[in-house]
A protein has these predicted regions:
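Short C-terminal tail/terminal secondary-structure segment
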Residues: 147, 234, 245-263
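Substrate-binding pocket helix/loop in short-chain dehydrogenase/reductase
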Residues: 99-100, 104-112, 213
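C-terminal helical subdomain
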Residues: 182, 204-240, 244, 251-253
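Conserved glycine-rich cofactor-binding loop
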Residues: 16-18
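Alpha-helical segment proximal to the catalytic Tyr-Lys
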Residues: 128, 171-175, 242
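Active-site helix of classical SDR
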Residues: 123, 158, 166
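Residue(s) in the substrate-gating loop at a strand-loop-helix junction
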Residues: 142
């Protein structure tokens, strides 16, 4: 299926690895122009080499998204160069495991800023151009906003807000034909997830923990791949989903909405 993304300029935050990288690479395969925002974290050269094998038309900006004021100049530069902005994928963020009883309000607010504010600012700055192009926004969220997890108070608050903003922005921009949707991720195999699994001990202990998790995923009892999330994201960015807005799309093998006791 042709997603009609050829030449579309799409921002992707946190795009050097994990889910963001998968989305950026898939956009490149579809002929889009990925504009990747990410801090320097040691993998930028590897990412550049990998995406360069797919396309020569992409942009990379080194930015700490906690520095919210740095977003607007990048948006203006991209618009000036290409003359249009067609999509935004808000992806960057991390689960910092800040729990209720041991987290100060200052650290809570800092976490919200790091996981939420840049979602707002990037859409705020690109909004006039998305109206021009009748573009699409995809916010990457997490199942912790829907299910709770424990020990994720700040992260759950940010991801819950992202789901709320998805529907608010969909309503606010519906008359401009700008579509806004969210991808709700549950258990996805990423470098961050792999590092987390390693904290459970030796290889046998890691495998035991991983099996406990995958056994609860109804569809095929396996983790969701980055590529599966990227494919759904690209579909939502494309005109092939032209009458889809305000939706929370769970890409999770049925983890949230199906009975986890299913054999």
């Amino acid at each position: 299926m042709d997603l009609h993304l050829e030449g579309k300029v799409v921002f992707v935050t946190g795009g050097f690895k994990g889910i963001g990288k998968g989305i950026a690479l898939q956009l490149a395969r579809e002929g889009a122009v990925p504009v990747v925002l990410n801090r320097k974290d040691g993998v930028e050269d590897e990412f550049r080499a990998e995406i360069s094998e797919i396309t020569k038309t992409f942009e990379m900006y080194y930015i700490d998204l906690n520095d919210t004021d740095a977003i607007a100049p990048i948006v203006e530069e991209v618009y000036k160069k290409y003359g249009h902005i067609d999509g935004v994928v808000n992806n960057a963020g991390r689960n910092d495991n800040l729990e209720l009883e041991t987290t100060s309000w200052q650290d809570f607010e800092k976490s919200l800023h790091g996981n939420l504010t840049h979602y707002f600012e990037l859409v705020h700055e690109t909004c006039p151009y998305l109206k021009e192009s009748k573009g699409s926004i995809v916010n990457i969220a997490s199942k912790v906003a829907l299910t709770g997890q424990g020990k994720t108070t700040a992260y759950a608050a940010a991801k819950g807000a992202i789901l709320g903003l998805t529907r608010e922005w969909a309503a606010a921009l519906v008359h401009d034909s700008v579509r806004v949707n969210a991808i709700v991720v549950a258990e996805a195999w990423t470098p961050l997830y792999a590092n987390w699994i390693k904290t459970f001990g030796d290889e046998e202990a890691q495998q035991k923990r991983l099996s406990l998790i995958t056994d609860r995923i109804p569809l095929e009892h396996r983790m969701t791949s980055v590529e599966e999330i990227a494919d759904t994201t690209c579909f939502l960015l494309s005109d092939r989903s032209s009458h889809t807005t305000g939706q929370w799309c769970n890409v999770d093998g049925g983890y949230v909405n199906l009975d986890r006791a299913l054999d």
